[in-house]
Amino acid sequence: MTDNQEIKPKKLTLGNSKLSLNKSFDSLTGAQSFVNAKSKTLVEVRKSSTGSTTTLSLNKERNSLDQTAIDANKEEFNRRLSILKKAAEQSKLNDPSQISTLSKLASINQSANSKIETLETEVEQKQQNAEEEKVEASAKTVQNNEDIQPQTSKKKEETFVKSPLVGMRTRYGIESEKELDKTVDNKVVAPKIKLEEPKKFKKADLFNMLGDDESGSGRTRSLASIKRAREKEKRKLVSQAPEKVYREVTIPEVIGVGDLANAMSERVADVIKELMKLGILANASQTIDADTAELVATNLGHTVKRVQESDVENVLISDDKVEDLRTRAPVVTVMGHVDHGKTSLLDALKSTDIAASETGGITQHIGAYRVTIADDRAITFIDTPGHEAFSEMRSRGAKVTDIVIIVVAADDGIKTQTVEAINHAKAAGVPIIVAINKIDKPDIDIERVKNELYVHEIIGEEAGGDVMVIPISALKKINLDKLEEAILLIAEMQDLKASPFGSAAGVVIESKIEKGRGTLTTILVQRGTLRNGDIIIAGSSYGKVKKMTNDKGLEIVEATPSVPVEIQGLNEVPFAGDKFNVVQNEKQAKDIAEYRMRLAKEKKISIAPRSSLEDLFLKASGNSKIKELPLIIKGDVQGSVEAISGSLLKLPSDEIKLRILHSGVGPITESDVSLAHASSAIIVGFNVRAGANALTAAEKEKVDIRYYSIIYNLIDDVKAIMSGMLDPIVREQYIGSVEIRQIFNITKVGKIAGSYVTKGIIKKGAGVRLLRDNVVIHEGKLKTLKRFKDEVKEVREGYECGIAFENYEDIREGDTVEVFELVQEQRQL
């Protein structure tokens, strides 16, 4: 049926219903436009949000088009018309009125399309006229341009009048565009249709409606077909291998295979293949050296940057600016022999009494104190123990100090620890001040002490040297002002400066564990400013500074150079003498701590004593002559524990091996008791005690726990234990001599030598040595000793007796017998 045949037999009637397309897909809500290719007049099908009504409106676009645009719009029109047909076919509401309405709409648009050919000539003519007008317009003034606008609107009106829908204007008597829009909205509508509940459409329906229908077959694609198409596209994307990226790989001295693969963004399997090519079998969890890792990375096309493991400590290196330097207080270390008055001198200087609280009158660990003297000038003192066991702690004290004061008792003179203190001070290269103490005592000789100092190259200023020798009395506070003046004078000559800016750094003086407070570490700040909340690394320990306390027990928030403080927050107990630094974050601190722990472990393995071949054979046979004394050492501070361990390991013994199973800071715990029970060890506690649970476990397991408060008592007891484990010395003790005068042969007994005791005493069972012509021909034991017919235990000098030897009868008259006993003596270390 043609376009004219459908319209002419009957006129369109006006009705109350509106033209509607009952499409089931909501995503096409909005306006769909169909463009007449001849006149570019738009016919819009407007669909409400419910998808139930469609209205037609005609809008005039423009008055000049080129032929290319006309052809393109014809194709667009045909494609959209095809979509509408599909929508009608897909809908399950096959209402005849709906199909009829759609046919009417299509016929109207087809009528417009049929007149395209008749207007082509007219369009070409209009294009030529437009070009001529464009040339004329460029030559006219702005006023002439304004006159062109009504002409343009007039042409648009002419275009509208001559549009393909001119038949509709004639049929319905419409004179203007407004009336045409109104007529279409009110008259060209479909009858009302009772709609069912809209069905929820599927993705497949949407693809089918919007799919290309160039073939015109109208075939509906199934959901499985769509899925297959999607999977095919995905496979194409996967098959396209991404371009390989070559990176710069940072390789440390040792790296794991998996870590190397991650650094290169390569598969672990590829890295393992490269290792196999090099003849190395390794899995992802194993480590390889830097050279091998470099070969693998180079073979895979990456560039390599070698770094050393020690580079993690580079963040700790920083230089102070000259303009930031400020004068700081001197750090003075007090050294000397036991009980020569070091702590008493500090008491006098800082007006406190620490010596009274110390066991045995000696300092058990390093203490750091800050003393303010005249003119508000401060001096930091470090009190090192005077006992010989703390030589290592003293050496650490000398490394952090600016000035060393060596205290010598005027009535005692130079002693062993005094010489060690002099040597430590010389090795540190720091100035020395000699304080001759106890000058208040009677019958002292200061000149004798000075002469003893000359022997060790300590020459006073009065003798032309550079060492200040000051006689003092700490008890009577004599000449203390002169000592302070000497300290400040040397400090001024040294021009001691440090920067209070930047990250803090310094040295650990002492550390311990206290119940309820955790790890307590005494540190000395050497540069920068330490604040609460800073993250520090000290040796292999690290943590966040939670609290700072000064030497007077007051809580402070920051510490500047030359200020000693006690901090809380480290995860472990550091060693006395370890350096500390402030780092940016906890990760940096952890990396540095792990690196230092690995170094310490490697060093410990490298210095471990090697067993000789003979010892290995003896151990394998179970006849080892080397005995072991296992010990567990617990102390109050790390420095004391370290000093005890060092002193005990220096005890000389080739037959007893002292093995320290565990040493640490803090009270004795149940785990210590369990370890001691498993290894038959002795637990030694220095200024610490065992808890209730540990004591109960020790009594049950019969573990020996010993407490000490003075270090040399501990060392003496361990030495005695080791001495008791040594094999005793067996020595011959001569007790008498016998002269053989007559030989008797007795049946069932053998030869009996009638003898005379010429010297000492002889005992039954004693050792004998038979001499003939002063040559020893037999050595054995005395089997029989008789006097007349009676068996006796001993015969003294001047008496006769009968003797017989065990398993030996070659005796003659005139032989001499020496009698001796074997005596065991306990050995000492």
Curated annotation (Swiss-Prot):
<feature type="region of interest" description="Disordered">
    <location>
        <begin position="128"/>
        <end position="157"/>
    </location>
</feature>
<feature type="compositionally biased region" description="Polar residues">
    <location>
        <begin position="140"/>
        <end position="152"/>
    </location>
</feature>
<dbReference type="Pfam" id="PF00009">
    <property type="entry name" value="GTP_EFTU"/>
</dbReference>
<keyword id="KW-0547">Nucleotide-binding</keyword>
<comment type="similarity">
    <text>Belongs to the TRAFAC class translation factor GTPase superfamily. Classic translation factor GTPase family. IF-2 subfamily.</text>
</comment>
<dbReference type="InterPro" id="IPR044145">
    <property type="entry name" value="IF2_II"/>
</dbReference>
<dbReference type="InterPro" id="IPR053905">
    <property type="entry name" value="EF-G-like_DII"/>
</dbReference>
<dbReference type="InterPro" id="IPR036925">
    <property type="entry name" value="TIF_IF2_dom3_sf"/>
</dbReference>
<dbReference type="Pfam" id="PF11987">
    <property type="entry name" value="IF-2"/>
</dbReference>
<dbReference type="Pfam" id="PF04760">
    <property type="entry name" value="IF2_N"/>
</dbReference>
<keyword id="KW-0342">GTP-binding</keyword>
<dbReference type="InterPro" id="IPR006847">
    <property type="entry name" value="IF2_N"/>
</dbReference>
<feature type="domain" description="tr-type G">
    <location>
        <begin position="327"/>
        <end position="497"/>
    </location>
</feature>
<feature type="binding site">
    <location>
        <begin position="336"/>
        <end position="343"/>
    </location>
    <ligand>
        <name>GTP</name>
    </ligand>
</feature>
<dbReference type="InterPro" id="IPR005225">
    <property type="entry name" value="Small_GTP-bd"/>
</dbReference>
<feature type="binding site">
    <location>
        <begin position="383"/>
        <end position="387"/>
    </location>
    <ligand>
        <name>GTP</name>
    </ligand>
</feature>
<keyword id="KW-0963">Cytoplasm</keyword>
<protein>
    <recommendedName>
        <fullName>Translation initiation factor IF-2</fullName>
    </recommendedName>
</protein>
<dbReference type="InterPro" id="IPR004161">
    <property type="entry name" value="EFTu-like_2"/>
</dbReference>
<dbReference type="InterPro" id="IPR015760">
    <property type="entry name" value="TIF_IF2"/>
</dbReference>
<dbReference type="GO" id="GO:0003924">
    <property type="term" value="F:GTPase activity"/>
</dbReference>
<feature type="binding site">
    <location>
        <begin position="437"/>
        <end position="440"/>
    </location>
    <ligand>
        <name>GTP</name>
    </ligand>
</feature>
<dbReference type="InterPro" id="IPR000178">
    <property type="entry name" value="TF_IF2_bacterial-like"/>
</dbReference>
<feature type="region of interest" description="G5">
    <location>
        <begin position="473"/>
        <end position="475"/>
    </location>
</feature>
<keyword id="KW-0648">Protein biosynthesis</keyword>
<dbReference type="InterPro" id="IPR009000">
    <property type="entry name" value="Transl_B-barrel_sf"/>
</dbReference>
<feature type="region of interest" description="G2">
    <location>
        <begin position="361"/>
        <end position="365"/>
    </location>
</feature>
<dbReference type="InterPro" id="IPR023115">
    <property type="entry name" value="TIF_IF2_dom3"/>
</dbReference>
<dbReference type="Pfam" id="PF22042">
    <property type="entry name" value="EF-G_D2"/>
</dbReference>
<dbReference type="GO" id="GO:0005525">
    <property type="term" value="F:GTP binding"/>
</dbReference>
<dbReference type="Pfam" id="PF03144">
    <property type="entry name" value="GTP_EFTU_D2"/>
</dbReference>
<dbReference type="InterPro" id="IPR000795">
    <property type="entry name" value="T_Tr_GTP-bd_dom"/>
</dbReference>
<feature type="region of interest" description="G3">
    <location>
        <begin position="383"/>
        <end position="386"/>
    </location>
</feature>
<dbReference type="GO" id="GO:0097216">
    <property type="term" value="F:guanosine tetraphosphate binding"/>
</dbReference>
<feature type="compositionally biased region" description="Basic and acidic residues">
    <location>
        <begin position="128"/>
        <end position="137"/>
    </location>
</feature>
<dbReference type="InterPro" id="IPR027417">
    <property type="entry name" value="P-loop_NTPase"/>
</dbReference>
<feature type="region of interest" description="G1">
    <location>
        <begin position="336"/>
        <end position="343"/>
    </location>
</feature>
<keyword id="KW-0396">Initiation factor</keyword>
<comment type="function">
    <text>One of the essential components for the initiation of protein synthesis. Protects formylmethionyl-tRNA from spontaneous hydrolysis and promotes its binding to the 30S ribosomal subunits. Also involved in the hydrolysis of GTP during the formation of the 70S ribosomal complex.</text>
</comment>
<feature type="region of interest" description="G4">
    <location>
        <begin position="437"/>
        <end position="440"/>
    </location>
</feature>
<dbReference type="GO" id="GO:0003743">
    <property type="term" value="F:translation initiation factor activity"/>
</dbReference>
<dbReference type="GO" id="GO:0005737">
    <property type="term" value="C:cytoplasm"/>
</dbReference>
